[in-house]
Amino acid sequence: TPVEFEVDTHFTEFGRAHNIVINEDSGYAYVVGSNGSPFNGGPIFINIQNPTEPILEGGFGEEGYSHDAQVVTYYGPDSDYTGKEILIGSNEDKVVIADVSDKSNPVTISNIDYSNISYTHQGWFTEDLRYFIVGDELDEQFIGTNTRTLIFDFNDLDNPSLSFEYFSDNTSIDHNGY
């Protein structure tokens, strides 16, 4: 028999979204891929520390539309940001690094692009937070490369760099590989 759930609350501060990213350490949800938001399609910050009473606390529109993101409480190699809440946005034509610790004043740390950009779709930190692995969803289709994974060196969040590219031996579109 199927289980039927009862609604605890209905949050109406945004319409559709591509994804909702949650940082369990901070108790915040980040809505990404939501065109038509007051933040130019950038992440929307929702306090879900009390899940039945979510609170809209702001957003980050400075770098434009974020299709996907990862948000972590940072304990990586860059000591300038230890303990800060860091958002890495896959923003269609670049990767954005932002400090979102202060929800009323998010700050761009840096951003980085790469050659043959088609659609910066998603990415994920390595466990040690030294590297960020990116999938460009449409480069195989529009540029004609084999499936490409980009590995960025994030040892210094102010100065990220492309470490290397990995090409597989097929031409599959890499959608949500990480």
Q: Where do the PLM segments sit?
A:
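Feature marking well-ordered beta-strand scaffolds used for ligand recognition
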Residues: T1-Y178
